[in-house]
């Protein structure tokens, strides 16, 4: 609760005395995730995400694979991980999950280009894609920077509606897109 975005979680790649180490962090995070995986199993949840936008941890492939395996011991439904926008082709362990999940905060005029890029990842891993976060604020200019939660300006419901229309239209033509989780923008 220090206000730092989880994408900034990072440690030295080699153990350094007096510094938090990846092994200890992943052990703690795995315990956290397996606790919630057991709850998700008990409640009959339809999908379990092992993390979201943890960009600086994604290169720790061995640890992520072990965490996903531990989650699968507790939760028997589909499992994934949600990468940040533009990060779909940076995760090397999509084969360990059931779908490729991403934060779909792409500019209104760039959806087709981004879907072309993401399609290559979907084909490589033979996995559908879920935009488990997607959305755009109702502020003038937000369709160009839909992930900017600090954007200030004039209310513009039409710009927000145009962004959603573009996203849904572009994705409707791509059978490998399995769905969306719409972020709670105003």
Where does each model-flagged region fall?
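Glycoside hydrolase catalytic-domain groove-lining segments
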Residues: 73, 78-80, 84-149, 165-181
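Active-site neighborhood of glycoside hydrolase catalytic domains
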Residues: 31-32, 42-47, 57-82
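Solvent-exposed, polar/charged alpha-helical surfaces in well-ordered, non-transmembrane soluble domains
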Residues: 34, 38, 69, 73, ...
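Substrate-binding cleft and catalytic face of glycoside hydrolase catalytic domains
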Residues: 1-57, 185-186
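A solvent-exposed, charged loop/short amphipathic helix patch at secondary-structure junctions
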Residues: 16-20, 139-161
């Amino acid at each position: 609760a220090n206000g730092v975005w989880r994408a900034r979680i990072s440690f030295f790649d080699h153990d350094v005395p007096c510094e938090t180490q990846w092994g200890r962090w992943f052990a703690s995070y795995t315990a956290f995730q397996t606790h919630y995986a057991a709850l998700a199993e008990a409640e009959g949840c339809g999908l379990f995400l092992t993390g979201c936008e943890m960009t600086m941890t994604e290169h720790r492939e061995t640890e992520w694979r072990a965490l996903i395996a531990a989650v699968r011991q507790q939760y028997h439904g589909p499992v994934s991980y949600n990468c940040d926008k533009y990060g779909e082709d940076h995760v090397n362990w999509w084969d360990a999950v059931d779908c490729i999940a991403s934060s779909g905060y792409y500019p209104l005029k760039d959806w087709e280009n981004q879907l072309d890029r993401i399609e290559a990842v979907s084909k490589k891993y033979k996995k559908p894609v879920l935009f488990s976060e997607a959305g755009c604020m109702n502020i003038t200019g937000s369709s160009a920077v839909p992930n900017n939660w600090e954007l200030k300006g004039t209310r513009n419901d039409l710009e927000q509606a145009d962004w959603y229309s573009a996203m849904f239209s572009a994705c409707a033509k791509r059978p490998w897109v399995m769905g969306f989780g719409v972020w709670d923008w105003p």
